[in-house]
A protein has these predicted regions:
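Conserved pre-motif I regulatory segment
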Residues: 4-48
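Short loop/turn elements that form and flank the Walker-type P-loop nucleotide-binding site
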Residues: 41, 71-72, 134-136, 158-160, ...
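Walker A/P-loop
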Residues: 42-63
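Conserved Walker A/P-loop ATP-binding site and its immediately adjacent core
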Residues: 56-61, 66-67, 71-103, 146
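Conserved nucleotide-binding/hydrolysis micro-motifs of P-loop NTPases
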Residues: 82-85, 145-148, 170-171, 200-205, ...
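Inter-Walker segment of RecA-like/P-loop motor cores
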Residues: 97-149
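SF2 helicase catalytic motif II
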Residues: 144-146, 155-197, 201
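Interdomain helical connector at the RecA1-RecA2 junction of SF1/SF2 helicase-like NTPases
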Residues: 194, 205-252
Length: 252
C-alpha cells in the first residue's frame, strides 16, 4: 500500500477576511487610494501597490486635485501599451462622493487612435501631443512610446507646469539606453513638472535599478502591500505557495 503524498507548502499565509479591500470612504476611495490621496501634494510621488488595488483610480483623484487645487495646467497619463489606456476612460467619481468627475475628451486618449506606436507612423500622435499642450484641455492619455517620441520632438520645456503620471513604472530604468528613464531624469533635474510613478513591482528582471538613488530620494513613497490587499478580501481564507519535484512523465 502506497502512502498518500504529503504536500507541505513553502509559504502558508492565513488572512482575516476583513472586507476592507472593497470598502470605500465618503469620497469613494478604497484604502490604497485614500492612502495615496493623502500624499497628493507631493511633487514627486511613487505608488507601489499590487494589481487590482485601484492605482488607476487613485491617480484620477490625485490628478484632479493637482489640476483644480495645485495650479498645474494639464495632466499627461503615460501607459506602456494601448490596451491599458482603457483604465483611464471617463469615470463619474461624483457618483461615489468625490467632488469632480474624471473626463478625457475622445481626441486626447491617443491609446484609442489608429496606427502603431513606432517612429515611422507615430508622427501624427506626436503632433496630437503638441496640439494638446497648446489647448486648454486638462487630460491626455498616451503610450510610453508616444510620450518618448513627443519629448524628443518637443523638448522637456514644453511640459513645464504639468503632471506626468507613468503607469507600470518598472518599464523605466536608470540605464542610459532607456530613453524614457533618461527623459524622466531630465524632467527631475529641470524640476518644473510633477511626477507620479505607479507600479505593482518596483524591480526589474535585468537587475538594473529603476531610478538612481539620488533621483529616487526625491520621491515620496506610498506602499500598499500584497498582504494588505489579500487580507482585505472577504472570501480568501488562506494562501499556500509551494514547489514540487516530479519523477517520470508529468501527466502521471
Amino acid at each position: 500500500m502506497t502512502e498518500p503524498i504529503k504536500q507541505v507548502p513553502s509559504v502558508s499565509v492565513t488572512y482575516k477576511r476583513t472586507g476592507a479591500t472593497n470598502k470605500s470612504n465618503e469620497l469613494g476611495m478604497r484604502p490604497m487610494q485614500e492612502r495615496a490621496y493623502e500624499r497628493r501634494g507631493e511633487q514627486y510621488l511613487l505608488i507601489k501597490s499590487p494589481p487590482a488595488s485601484g492605482k488607476s483610480r487613485a491617480l484620477m483623484f490625485i490628478a484632479l486635485d493637482k489640476l483644480h487645487n495645485q495650479g498645474l495646467s494639464q495632466a499627461i497619463i503615460v501607459v506602456p501599451e494601448r490596451s491599458i489606456g482603457a483604465s483611464f476612460n471617463n469615470e463619474p467619481l461624483t457618483r461615489w462622493g468625490f467632488w469632480a468627475d474624471w473626463e478625457v475628451r475622445p481626441q486626447w486618449n491617443l491609446c484609442n487612435a489608429p496606427g502603431a506606436d513606432d517612429i515611422r507612423v507615430a508622427k501624427s500622435k506626436v503632433q496630437a501631443v503638441g496640439a494638446f499642450l497648446a489647448s486648454g484641455d486638462p487630460v491626455l492619455v498616451c503610450t510610453h512610446a508616444t510620450f518618448r517620441f513627443a519629448v524628443e520632438e518637443l523638448g522637456i520645456e514644453a511640459f513645464d507646469n504639468r503632471l506626468i503620471a507613468v503607469d507600470e513604472f518598472h518599464h523605466v530604468s536608470a540605464d542610459d539606453d532607456n530613453v524614457l528613464g533618461s527623459q524622466l531624469k531630465a524632467f527631475i533635474a529641470r524640476d518644473k513638472v510633477h511626477l507620479v510613478a505607479m507600479t505593482g513591482s518596483y524591480f526589474r528582471g535585468d537587475a538594473v535599478p529603476v531610478l538612481m538613488p539620488e533621483d529616487e530620494a526625491r520621491f515620496a513613497t506610498v506602499t500598499y502591500t500584497y498582504y494588505e490587499q489579500l487580507n482585505g478580501y472577504e472570501h480568501l481564507k488562506a494562501l499556500d505557495i509551494g514547489y514540487f519535484f516530479y519523477n517520470g512523465p508529468y501527466v502521471d
